[in-house]
Amino acid sequence: MIQKPILLSSFLFLYIRALLHSIHPYIRTSVHLYTKKITSYNFLGVPFK
């Protein structure tokens, strides 16, 4: 009975970690595009679209 919550929490942790790993590339690319937009805006003086 004591080991069931531990097993459940570890499974939940692994699930959340896998979810974050699947979401991470999307966040990274969106942040990269956002920073690229900011740098091009600063470089050209006009918003880059």
Swiss-Prot record:
Residues 1-22 form the signal peptide. One of its GO terms (cellular component) is fungal-type vacuole. This is Uncharacterized protein YLR406C-A. It comes from the Eukaryota. It comes from Saccharomyces cerevisiae (strain ATCC 204508 / S288c) (Baker's yeast). Keywords: Signal.
